[in-house]
Regions:
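Short acidic, glycine/serine/threonine-rich helix-capping segments at coil-helix boundaries
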Residues: 151-161, 165-211
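Short, compositionally biased P/S/T/A/G/V-rich stretches that sit at domain boundaries
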Residues: 34-62
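Exported/periplasmic cell-wall-interacting domains
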Residues: 81, 162, 169, 218-224, ...
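Conserved aromatic beta-strand anchor motif in extracellular beta-sandwich/beta-rich domains
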Residues: 84-88
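Enriched for extracellular/lumenal, surface-exposed ectodomains of secreted and cell-surface proteins
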Residues: 118-137, 289
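Solvent-exposed serine/threonine-rich low-complexity stretches and specific carbohydrate-binding patches
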Residues: 93-105
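Secretory targeting and sorting signals
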Residues: 1-32
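Aromatic/hydrophobic beta-strand junction motif of beta-rich domains
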Residues: 65-75
Length: 348
């Protein structure tokens, strides 16, 4: 009979023979924290300012006239805005905030008009302040010198430069040197004739406003005549016209007085006489009988000749050089009418 073990020992042995309980599972490692999202750096841009409707370098304008500052911004970001400030004598006088319009190639632009009620320098500055989408950046400032519109013989400076530039743009014969000399005075008189203004060799606000609007251009009547001359007896001006009706040059002139009127009609230059003749006519271009386009010492603002078309002597040489034998000459009154009778004694 097998030997029985004591009870405590049996219990201990039974416990030893039982399978071991599994070890508790290890706790899972904590998940790694997500990396913080990176915010893209705000884009940096650039602004280029351009002043429009001003003349020369440095830009000049007339007080009361509107100038436009145009800003080109790159890169263009929808919804972004630019602050434009205007300074006079270092003091801020106006601030405007403007939006941008896309213009392609990743750029945008803005236009902002401004003017000055007094003479002096006005500076425009543009800044884009930082936003989440764009960093802060600015453009190079632009300065405009505003000048009085009242200039006359002997004046020099920005107002005269503006005057000469505007007259030249309308094809009046004028120097571009910033001096109100005799040639500038002649151009002003020619312009005033065409624009229907008082015939004085000076300027004012009205004249500059009309120039800015393009008033006072010469209206070509005979576009089909190609390269030709037109003499407007109503306004007392003469114009050289290129093919397709392009105005080349406009001059003041004086035609035949009422007792010896200039004949109207369509003619062609048939003879040219350089220099001065016995009657004091300079560089003459004859278009019918004794009627000629020529220089003369006296060219009043009204019809005063014996039938010829007088032009200032300083303009006679250039007209003589431009006109050829066979060049058409159209002489007319704007409202029609005029004398068709050829006077055999026509002269200066």
């Amino acid at each position: 009979m097998p030997r029985r073990l004591p009870l405590p020992f049996a219990i201990l042995l039974g416990s030893a023979l039982l399978p071991a309980a599994p070890a508790p599972a290890a706790a899972p490692a904590p998940a790694a924290a997500p990396a913080p999202a990176t915010t893209p750096a705000a884009a940096r841009g650039r602004i280029r300012l351009v002043v429009e409707h001003a003349v020369g370098s440095p830009p000049a304008a007339i007080i009361g006239m509107q100038i436009v500052v145009r800003g080109i911004v790159a890169p263009y970001v929808a919804g972004e805005r630019v602050k434009v400030s205007f300074y006079r004598d270092g003091r801020k006088v106006q601030v405007r905030t403007v939006g941008l319009t896309p213009i392609g190639k990743g750029a945008g632009q803005f236009h902002l008009g401004f003017s000055s009620a007094r003479a002096g320098l006005l500076q425009a500055r543009a800044v884009h302040y930082a936003t989440p989408a764009q960093a802060q950046f600015s453009g190079r400032s632009q300065t405009v010198r505003f000048a009085s519109p009242n200039v006359s013989s002997g004046a020099r400076g920005p107002a005269v430069r503006v005057l000469q530039s505007e007259l030249n743009a309308l094809h009046y014969v004028v120097p571009l040197d910033g001096l109100f000399d005799a040639a500038t005075a002649r151009a002003v008189i020619a312009y005033r004739k065409v624009a229907g203004l008082e015939l004085v060799p000076s300027t004012n606000t009205q004249l500059f406003r009309l120039l800015a609007r393009g008033v006072g251009s010469f209206r070509v009547r005979f576009r089909g005549d190609g390269r030709h001359v037109e003499a407007d007896l109503s306004r007392q001006v003469l114009a050289e016209i290129e093919p397709r009706g392009r105005v080349l040059a406009i001059f003041t002139m004086s035609s035949g007085k009422p007792s010896t009127p200039t004949v109207v009609g369509h003619f062609r230059v048939y003879s040219k006489t350089p220099g001065v003749n016995a009657e004091g006519m300079v560089d003459s271009n004859y278009f019918i009988a004794g009627y000629a386009i020529h220089g003369y010492p006296e060219v009043p603002n009204y019809a005063a000749s014996h039938g010829c078309l007088r032009v200032p002597i300083p303009n006679a040489a250039s007209i003589f050089s431009w006109v050829r034998i066979g060049t058409p000459v159209d002489v007319y009154h704007e409202t029609g009418g005029g004398s068709h009778r050829v006077n055999s004694h026509a002269g200066p």
